[in-house]
Amino acid sequence: MAERVAAFLKNVWAKEPVLVASFAIAGLAVILPTLSPYTKYSLMINRATPYNYPVPLRDDGNMPDVPSHPQDPQGPSLEWLKRL
C-alpha cells in the first residue's frame, strides 16, 4: 500500500509539481493552526471573555443577579494572561 502511494506521489510530482505543492501547502494550512500555541491561548481568552456584558441598571436591592457596579469582577479571571 505504501509502495503504491509512494509511486503515485512520485508520478504526480513528475507531471504536476505545482498542484502537489499547492495541496501540500493547503494541508499544512489546515493542520498547523491546531498545533500552534496561539490557538491554545486564544481559546482560553475566548472562554474567559463574557458574551453578555453588564448593562447599567438602577439597583433597588431586589436584584441579586445584577452586579452592584458594571466593573465588578465576575466570571473566570484573566490573571494567567497578565503573567505570560
UniProtKB/Swiss-Prot annotation:
The modification N-acetylalanine is found at A2. Its main location: mitochondrion. Pfam families: NADHdh_A3. The chain crosses the membrane at residues 18-38. Residues 56-84 are annotated as: Disordered. GO terms for cellular component: mitochondrial inner membrane; mitochondrion; respiratory chain complex I. It is found in: Mitochondrion inner membrane. Keywords: Acetylation, Electron transport, Membrane, Mitochondrion, Mitochondrion inner membrane, Respiratory chain, Transmembrane, Transmembrane helix, Transport. It is a single-pass membrane protein. InterPro entries: NDUFA3. PANTHER family: NADH DEHYDROGENASE [UBIQUINONE] 1 ALPHA SUBCOMPLEX SUBUNIT 3 (PTHR15221:SF0). Complex I is composed of 45 different subunits. Belongs to the complex I NDUFA3 subunit family. Accessory subunit of the mitochondrial membrane respiratory chain NADH dehydrogenase (Complex I), that is believed not to be involved in catalysis. Complex I functions in the transfer of electrons from NADH to the respiratory chain. The immediate electron acceptor for the enzyme is believed to be ubiquinone. This is NADH dehydrogenase [ubiquinone] 1 alpha subcomplex subunit 3. It comes from Bos taurus (Bovine). The gene is NDUFA3.
